[in-house]
Swiss-Prot record:
Family according to the record: Belongs to the radical SAM superfamily. Lipoyl synthase family.
Residues that bind [4Fe-4S] cluster 2: 107, 111, 114
Amino acid composition bias (Basic and acidic residues), ranges on this chain: 21-36
Cofactor note: Binds 2 [4Fe-4S] clusters per subunit. One cluster is coordinated with 3 cysteines and an exchangeable S-adenosyl-L-methionine.
Biological classification of the source: Bacteria, Pseudomonadati, Pseudomonadota, Betaproteobacteria, Burkholderiales
MF annotations from Gene Ontology: 4 iron, 4 sulfur cluster binding; lipoate synthase activity; metal ion binding
Keywords: 4Fe-4S, Cytoplasm, Iron, Iron-sulfur, Metal-binding, S-adenosyl-L-methionine, Transferase
Protein name: Lipoyl synthase
Domain of life: Bacteria
UniProt gene name: lipA
Binding site for [4Fe-4S] cluster 1: 81, 86, 92, 321
Stretch list, region Disordered: 1-36
Organism: Cupriavidus taiwanensis (strain DSM 17343 / BCRC 17206 / CCUG 44338 / CIP 107171 / LMG 19424 / R1) (Ralstonia taiwanensis (strain LMG 19424))
Composition-biased stretches (Low complexity): 7-20
Database matches in InterPro entries: Aldolase_TIM (IPR013785), Elp3/MiaA/NifB-like_rSAM (IPR006638), LIAS_N (IPR031691), Lipoyl_synth (IPR003698), rSAM (IPR007197)
Pathway: Protein modification; protein lipoylation via endogenous pathway; protein N(6)-(lipoyl)lysine from octanoyl-[acyl-carrier-protein]: step 2/2
C-alpha cells in the first residue's frame, strides 16, 4: 500500500516488546517489533542530513485538523494519514481531506519501509462501510481515497469489503468520486477482480513502490510482475477507469531503474503516476540512502509525459493520495 508507506522520521508511539516478552500475534507491532521478524536484516546506515527542500506544512490554527480527527474517532474510522505517519497530515486534515484506511489497522505484511502496524487482523467490521459512507457525506467530500492494510487472511483479500464501501458511499454521496488504493490481492487476483467488477472505483490505484531489484528488501511477500499484472488486468476489464501507481525514491535505486519502471507501467496501461521521496519512519526501518534533488524530480516528470502518462505528480513531498483530487482533475478524470 502506499501512501502509507512513505513516512517522516519519527519514533513509534508504541513501546517495543522486549525479547523476553511473550509474542502475541494479536498485538499491533510497530517499529522494531514489526521489523525484527522479517527475513531481511536492516543494516543501519549513516543518517543523511535532510536537505532544505524537504519541508512539511503544519496545520494552521484555523484549519479543520481537530474537527476531522474528532469525526473519524466518533465513527470508529482509521486513516492511513495517521497510521503511516504521513508527513502531509497537517495540510490534508487542515483542508478537510483524508485517505480512509479500511479493514483495520493491522497489516498481514511487514514491509520495512512502512509504518502501518503488523499483526493478526481483527474480524472485518460489518458496520464500517456504513460508517465510512456517513462520514464522507458528513464531511461533504467531492473526492475520496479509500485504502487498506493487506488482508492475506481473507479469501478474497478484502475485495468484497472494498465493494461494500464504494457502493454505500455512492448511495449517500452519488456525486463523490472514489479512488481506491488497493493491496496486491496475492494468490487471489482473479477472484478479487471479479468481485470489483460489481462496483468499480472511479480511479484504480496500486503502488509499485520501488524498482524490482529492491523488492525482496523493501516488499517481502510482494511480486513486481504480479503488481503490474493487477493494474493491467483491471484496465483490460475496465478500459474507461484510469489506473494509477506510485514510486518512492531514496532506497538505493538508480534514476535509470526508476525510468525503466515507468516504461513498464506504460507498457501495462497505467495512466497516472506519483513519485515522492522516501522518509524513514524510524531507525528500525529501511534507511534513506539518498535525497533526490528537485531537478531530478523535474526530469522524472518530463519523462513521464513523454512516455504518455496522463498525469504525473512528482516531487519530494508527493504521496500517492496527496492532492489526489487535483491529480484526477488535471488528468481529466474528475
Amino acid at each position: 500500500m502506499s501512501d502509507a508507506l512513505i513516512a517522516p522520521n519519527a519514533s513509534s508511539s508504541e513501546a517495543p516488546q522486549s525479547p523476553a516478552e511473550h509474542y502475541d500475534p494479536t498485538r499491533k507491532q510497530k517499529s522494531a517489533d514489526k521489523t525484527a521478524r522479517i527475513p531481511i536484516k536492516i543494516v543501519p546506515a549513516e543518517k543523511l542530513k535532510k536537505p532544505d527542500w524537504i519541508r512539511v506544512k503544519a496545520a494552521t490554527g484555523n484549519s479543520r485538523f481537530y474537527e476531522i480527527k474528532d469525526i473519524l474517532r466518533a465513527n470508529n474510522l482509521v486513516t492511513v494519514c495517521e497510521e503511516a505517519s504521513c508527513p502531509n497530515i497537517g495540510e490534508c486534515f487542515g483542508k478537510g481531506t483524508a485517505t480512509f484506511m479500511i479493514m483495520g489497522d493491522k497489516c498481514t505484511r511487514r514491509c520495512p519501509f512502512c509504518d502501518v502496524g503488523h499483526g493478526r487482523p481483527d474480524p472485518l467490521d460489518v458496520n464500517e462501510p456504513g460508517n465510512l459512507a456517513r462520514t464522507i457525506a458528513q464531511l461533504k467530500l467531492n473526492y475520496v481515497v479509500i485504502t487498506s492494510v493487506d488482508r492475506d487472511d481473507l479469501r478474497d483479500g478484502g475485495a468484497q469489503h472494498y465493494v461494500d464501501c464504494i457502493s454505500q458511499t455512492r448511495e449517500l454521496s452519488p456525486a463523490t468520486r472514489i479512488e481506491v488504493l488497493v493491496p496486491d490481492f496475492r494468490g487471489r487476483l482473479d477472484k478479487a477482480l471479479d468481485i470489483l467488477q460489481a462496483c468499480p472505483p472511479d480511479v484504480m490505484n496500486h503502488n509499485m513502490e520501488t524498482v524490482p531489484r529492491l523488492y525482496k528488501q523493501a516488499r517481502p511477500g510482494a511480486d513486481y510482475a504480479h503488481s503490474l499484472k493487477l493494474l493491467q488486468e483491471f484496465k483490460r476489464r475496465n478500459p474507461n477507469v484510469p489506473t494509477k501507481s506510485g514510486l518512492m525514491v531514496g532506497l538505493g535505486e538508480t534514476d535509470e531503474e526508476i525510468l525503466e519502471v515507468m516504461r513498464d507501467m506504460r507498457a501495462h496501461d497505467i495512466d497516472m503516476l506519483t513519485i515522492g521521496q522516501y522518509l524513514a519512519p524510524s531507525n528500525h526501518h529501511l534507511p534513506v540512502l539518498r535525497y533526490v534533488h528537485p531537478d531530478t524530480f523535474k526530469m522524472f516528470e518530463e519523462e513521464a509525459y513523454k512516455m504518455g502518462f496522463t498525469h504525473a505528480a512528482v516531487g519530494a513531498m508527493v504521496r500517492s493520495s496527496y492532492h489526489a483530487d487535483q491529480q484526477a482533475h488535471q488528468a481529466g478524470f474528475a
